Swiss-Prot record:
Residues 33-57 are annotated as: Disordered. Residues 33-42 have a biased composition (Polar residues). It comes from the Eukaryota. This is Putative uncharacterized protein DDB_G0286949. Residues 43-57 have a biased composition (Low complexity).
Length: 94
């Protein structure tokens, strides 16, 4: 948990050091990971085919899906995973 908070704080500090104009001020939003899309992995170590997983293996797929579903007026800057099974989405409105 503490590691996750430190990671989030570090990312926020990096963003705060960027000079966003008021039009591009980032919005911070936390979403429970179980509300995000679930994808299938071809195989896991136990040979269970098509096992659903949110274990971070498909993180890039999850991120790109969120970018498409947020809409054209918002752009996802990054997704931060923490130790409490939550993902913090940092995005800005256009």
């Amino acid at each position: 948990m503490n590691r996750g908070i430190r990671t989030i704080t570090r990312h926020f500090n990096k963003l705060n050091n960027l000079n966003f104009s008021s039009k591009y001020t980032p919005t911070f939003k936390t979403t429970p990971i179980n509300s995000l899309p679930t994808f299938t992995k071809p195989n896991d170590s136990n040979n269970n085919v098509n096992k659903s997983s949110n274990d971070g293996v498909n993180n890039n797929i999850i991120t790109s899906t969120i970018m498409r579903t947020i809409g054209f007026d918002q752009f996802l800057l990054c997704v931060i995973n923490d130790d409490d099974d939550e993902q913090t989405l940092i995005y800005q409105n256009f």
